């Protein structure tokens, strides 16, 4: 397997509960390495731009407001088959359906407040990484 990169967000419900370290620990224990990380408060423009794919969905406004409600931690993760590895450790979007030992099973409050975002493909990972990071901010 090739070493690849993926993008992750530790969402407001997790940062509000001081879970950044616990979530990052689970990512690292899954074989992912944090090669870039920053804690930010997402602007409306950032949230709407990042989630533009959902613009026509009924939950779009609520999602944007949620992502602006508290700080988030945006990260670039690196590891073998990073996208799949990250999605496996995140668990299902609905925490009630997430496997034991996954981030969402352990920490998510609901489908909406589900602790983490992770890229769903290598192609989207690159787009999402480029949305928040300049190449010189990523230190492998």
Curated annotation (Swiss-Prot):
UniProt-annotated location(s): Cytoplasm
Listed cofactors: Mg(2+)
CDD domains given in the database record: NDPk_I
Keywords: ATP-binding, Cytoplasm, Kinase, Magnesium, Metal-binding, Nucleotide metabolism, Nucleotide-binding, Phosphoprotein, Transferase
Reaction it catalyzes: a 2'-deoxyribonucleoside 5'-diphosphate + ATP = a 2'-deoxyribonucleoside 5'-triphosphate + ADP; a ribonucleoside 5'-diphosphate + ATP = a ribonucleoside 5'-triphosphate + ADP
SMART domains: NDK (SM00562)
Active site per database record: 117
GO cellular component: cytoplasm
EC numbers for this chain: 2.7.4.6
Keyword Oxidoreductase annotated: no
Enzyme class per UniProt: transferase
Biological processes per GO annotation: CTP biosynthetic process; GTP biosynthetic process; UTP biosynthetic process
Presence of keyword Ion transport: no
SUPFAM superfamilies, A to Z: Nucleoside diphosphate kinase, NDK
Chain positions recorded as ATP binding sites: 11, 59, 87, 93, 104, 114
InterPro entries hit by this protein: NDK-like_dom, NDK-like_dom_sf, Nucleoside_diP_kinase, Nucleoside_diP_kinase_AS
Alphabetized GO MF terms: ATP binding; metal ion binding; nucleoside diphosphate kinase activity
Signal peptide positions (record): none
Function according to Swiss-Prot or TrEMBL: Major role in the synthesis of nucleoside triphosphates other than ATP. The ATP gamma phosphate is transferred to the NDP beta phosphate via a ping-pong mechanism, using a phosphorylated active-site intermediate.
Protein family (similarity comment): Belongs to the NDK family.
Matching NCBIfam families: PRK00668.1
Subunit structure as annotated in this protein's UniProt entry: Homotetramer.
Protein name: Nucleoside diphosphate kinase
């Amino acid at each position: 397997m090739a070493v690849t990169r993926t993008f992750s967000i530790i969402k407001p419900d997790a940062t509000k509960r001081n879970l950044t370290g616990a979530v990052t620990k689970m990512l690292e224990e899954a074989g992912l390495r944090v090669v870039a990380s920053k804690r930010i408060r997402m602007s409306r423009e950032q949230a709407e731009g990042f989630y533009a794919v959902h613009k026509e969905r009924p939950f779009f406004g609520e999602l944007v407001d949620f992502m602006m409600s508290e700080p988030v931690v945006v990260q670039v993760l690196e590891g073998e088959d990073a996208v799949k590895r990250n999605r496996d450790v995140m668990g299902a979007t609905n925490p009630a359906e997430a496997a034991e030992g996954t981030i969402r099973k352990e920490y998510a409050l609901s489908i909406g407040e589900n602790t983490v975002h992770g890229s769903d493909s290598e192609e989207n990972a690159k787009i999402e990484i480029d949305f928040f990071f300049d190449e010189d901010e990523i230190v492998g």
